[in-house]
Regions:
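N-terminal subdomain of nucleotide-sugar transferases
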Residues: 1-49
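Conserved nucleotide-sugar donor-interacting segment of glycosyltransferase catalytic cores
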Residues: 82-151, 204-206
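Phosphate/nucleotide-donor binding subsite
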Residues: 49-98, 147-156, 173
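Short, structured coil segments at secondary-structure junctions
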Residues: 46-47, 116-118, 193, 216-218
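Structural motif
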Residues: 2, 97-98, 196
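Generic beta-sheet signal
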Residues: 34-36, 53, 102, 123-126, ...
Length: 223
């Protein structure tokens, strides 16, 4: 059995997937990782195959690249990011039996898994990534977000967050899905996070606040 583990981020995003990969290897699985090129030499030294994706994170860690761009340049970068993901993850996933994606920039992996007819699992490292009436969505300053008041209506904020996901990524993702013969995505955030994500966080330090409103929250498995 072969598993593809994919993330786009810095060391804190990559290392948990590497730990998962080592455990899967110990169980006899073949593991392949899609990660930024910075980590290739280290991970290959652990006996796992690496397919580089995205830019080196060292070059983007000091300044948020989107914060310094015009809206048109932001759109071009977003389109390029999605196109690169569909190409890279699409090639890396060939011959794999499952895709595990971590961090919310997994914009192509769910479509690639659907196209190949294999399972896809999204993993969050912190409860705040996942919709819940008990906390606010992540604050993205480059998008113009500001921290909400302590007693804000979190459900309304999550509803707006879903609208923002659709506005930012919907048409870009749907264009690539159409090329694969897949239907458009109605809810981009749910498409990325899935309805049954894993929460890889210590249940004491980062517990999932159950019970919750099933109409607005996914069914979370805390690992």
């Amino acid at each position: 059995m072969r598993a593809l583990l994919s993330t786009i981020g810095s060391r804190g995003d990559v290392q948990p997937l590497v730990a998962l990969g080592e455990q899967l290897q110990a169980l006899g699985l073949e593991v392949r990782l899609c990660v930024p090129p910075d980590f290739r030499e280290w991970i290959e030294g652990l006996g796992m195959a690496v397919v580089p994706i995205g830019p080196e994170v060292r070059s983007t860690g000091k300044v948020d690249p989107l914060a310094t761009l015009t809206p048109q340049q932001q759109r071009q970068m977003m389109e390029g990011t999605v196109a690169s993901q569909f190409e890279t993850i699409g090639a890396a996933a060939r011959g794999c039996d499952i895709i595990v994606g971590a961090t919310a920039l997994q914009l192509a992996a769910p479509s690639v898994a659907q196209h190949l007819g294999i399972p896809y699992v999204f993993v969050a490292y912190c409860p705040i990534v996942l919709p819940s009436r008990h906390h606010a969505p992540p604050v993205l300053t480059w998008r113009g977000d500001a921290p909400p008041p302590a007693m804000a209506d979190y459900r309304a904020l999550w509803a707006k967050d879903a609208q923002d996901w659709n506005a930012m990524w919907g048409s870009i993702i749907d264009a690539h899905r159409a090329a694969l013969g897949l239907a458009p995505v109605g809810d981009v955030r749910s498409y990325v996070l899935t309805n049954q994500p894993w929460l890889a966080a210590d249940p004491t330090l980062g517990p999932w606040p159950e019970p919750d409103d099933a109409a607005t929250s996914p069914t979370v498995t805390q690992t």
